[in-house]
From Swiss-Prot:
It holds the Pfam family Terpene_synth. Belongs to the terpene synthase family. Its cofactor is Mg(2+); Mn(2+). The Asp-Asp-Xaa-Xaa-Asp/Glu (DDXXD/E) motif is important for the catalytic activity, presumably through binding to Mg(2+). This is (E)-beta-farnesene synthase. Induction: Induced in leaves by herbivory (e.g. S.littoralis). Mg(2+) 2 binds at residues 286, 290. Pathway: Secondary metabolite biosynthesis; terpenoid biosynthesis. GO terms for cellular component: cytoplasm. Keywords: Cytoplasm, Lyase, Magnesium, Manganese, Metal-binding, Plant defense. A motif (DDXXD motif) lies at residues 286-290. InterPro entries: Isoprenoid_synthase_dom_sf, Terpene_cyclase-like_1_C, Terpene_cyclase_plant_C1, Terpene_synth_N, Terpene_synth_N_sf, Terpene_synthase-like, Terpene_synthase_metal-bd, Terpenoid_cyclase/PrenylTrfase.
């Protein structure tokens, strides 16, 4: 057994007792928020007469985390924007924002609109910081073959970095820093609200009703998140991780943070709870099979999961047996929570876990045989499912409404191309962030190491190549996102949101494993309310 020393939980049972200081004001905040929602709705309807105002208002509501209150109004406005030519096509800010919002909402618009902003030598002609930001963000909803958007990213990034050398207005400087760190399309929506509320509060043209509603909306959501954290922490404590599973990553709060990053709206509370539990259980499986167990023990656990029956626990060593039985019990309890009309969905939780375990077994076999996949594609075919991202995304669908049908789950079980793009993005990001740690722990060959061995490169060179492949996978995802299907758009939107969480968690390091790197942001999301004044 090769047990890697993971740091202990940073939160323990903190959320069992914690209540945000805003809790006593919940009733008043709810009443005030309802009044403001209608006031903002009137503002949104009034903006329909002018495309630029409509675009500005939509992007503001999205960034402040308010757009889910106005889904129908925003969809109607964007249909009008899509069909109308009544806008200034010489204004790069407007053209970029229009392009970004339409693509984000699934409308197919051509990137050729940006060629008119280049001179005879093919260089972009723009030096206004606001326009640069808009173009940079628009370029990241690119697909394959859109050379003009690839060039726009290179150009605008260089210009934005240079702009920080000159004095900028505080709100604009904050925007540039935020954008260079992560383009708008890839940011977690709930964290974007936390970051953008203070920026919006500095803007001269801010709408005070929208600003107040954004603060109330976040504080009310935070109360719901804390209730969920109490529930999942108490559930997690029953496993007695510190004593029985001391070798695993004890990360229940981080699991919930991850799920909230992908499904932040209040109506998805059950979805977050189920997905958080599944993420925690998948983490235990991963650490058992990848890091701690012997090959024989790992294969016994895999066999027990294939069988999915209590009697199979007799196959297992003591430290696996209790976990296995708790896994079965948890899936059964999820069925009870879902009720008779939706309990069938737990079948798909089981099937997704079996796929995960099958892939992990293959990786163990590779490790034991010192086998290196011949290509990155071969590697991803097996290692994509084992990163767990798609299983977690599917577990979030289990707790969602009736728009997610049995046919939806059957389709997801075929691992459609959109699912593969999520798995590839997550695996490549994970490997880039985790390679050095896992190499030292004697684990299976990552995509980074696979590339190094096949091409004779350094680790840094291989990481750069893997980053290029990650960008290609984002382009794959965008193309598939824009392709109409018979399945609810919510599925594609949520899968993209899970890709965003992977980008956040693995941007600089493995933030899930080394969770002190995200502790401050977890506190901002779950512990610290936003001041109304």
């Amino acid at each position: 057994m090769d047990a890697t020393a993971f740091h202990p939980s940073l939160w323990g049972d903190f959320f069992v007792k914690y209540k945000p200081p805003t809790a006593p004001k919940r009733g008043h905040m709810t009443e005030r928020a309802e009044l403001l929602k209608e006031e903002v709705r009137k503002t949104l309807k009034a903006a329909a007469n002018q495309i630029t105002n409509a675009l500005d208002l939509i992007i503001t509501l999205q960034r402040l985390g308010l757009d889910h209150h106005y889904e129908n109004e925003i969809s109607e406005l964007l249909r009008f924007v899509y069909s109308s030519s009544d806008y200034d096509d010489k204004d790069l800010y407007v053209v970029s924002l229009r392009f970004y919002l339409l693509r984000k909402h699934g409308h197919c618009v051509s990137s050729d609109v940006f060629t008119s902003f280049k001179d005879e030598e093919g260089n972009f002609v723009v030096d206004d910081t606001k326009c640069l930001l808009s173009l940079y963000n628009a370029a990241y909803v690119r697909t394959h073959g859109e050379k003009v958007l690839d060039e726009a990213i290179t150009f605008t990034r260089r210009q934005l970095e240079a702009s920080l050398l000159d004095p900028l207005e505080p709100a604009l400087a904050d925007e540039v820093h935020l954008t260079l760190q992560t383009p708008l399309f890839r940011r977690l929506r709930i964290l974007e609200a936390i970051n953008y509320i203070p920026i919006y509060g500095k803007e001269a043209g801010r709408n005070e009703a929208i600003l107040e509603l954004a603060k109330l909306n976040f504080n009310l959501a935070q109360l719901i998140y804390c209730e969920e954290l109490k529930e999942v922490t108490l559930w997690w404590k029953q496993l007695n991780v510190e004593t029985n599973l001391s070798f695993i990553r004890d990360r229940i709060v981080e699991c919930h943070f991850w799920m909230t990053g992908a499904c932040c709206e209040p109506q998805y509370s059950l979805s977050r709870v189920i997905a958080t539990k599944m993420t925690a259980l998948i983490t235990v499986l991963d650490d058992m099979m990848d890091t701690y167990s012997t090959t024989e023990e790992a294969m016994l656990l895999a066999e027990a999961i294939y069988r999915w029956e209590e009697n199979a626990a007799e196959l297992l060593p003591r430290y696996m047996k209790d976990f296995y039985l708790y896994l079965l019990k948890t899936i059964d309890s999820c069925g009870d929570e879902l009720g008779p009309n939706r309990s069938f969905r737990t079948f798909y939780l089981k099937e997704m876990l079996k796929v995960l375990v099958r892939g992990s077994s293959q990786e163990i076999k590779w490790r034991n045989e010192n086998y290196v996949p011949k290509t990155i594609s071969e590697h991803l075919e097996h290692s994509g499912p084992t990163v767990g991202a798609f299983q977690v995304a599917c577990s979030s669908f289990v707790g969602m409404g009736d728009s997610i049908t049995k046919e939806s789950f059957e389709w997801l079980l075929t691992y459609p191309e959109l699912a593969k793009s999520l798995m590839n993005i997550s695996r490549l990001l994970n490997d880039t962030a985790s390679t050095k740690r896992e190499q030292n722990a004697g684990q299976h060959v990552s995509t980074v190491q696979c590339y190094m061995l096949k091409h004779g490169t350094t680790m840094d060179e291989a990481c750069e190549k893997i980053k290029e492949l990650t960008e290609d996978s984002w382009k794959d995802m965008m193309e598939l996102y824009l392709t109409p299907t018979e399945h609810p758009k919510l599925i594609a939107q949520t899968i993209v949101d899970f890709a965003r969480t992977a980008d956040y968690m693995y941007k600089e390091t493995d933030g899930f494993t080394f969770s002190h790197t995200i502790k401050d942001m977890i506190a901002k999301l779950f512990v610290d309310p936003i001041s109304l004044f």
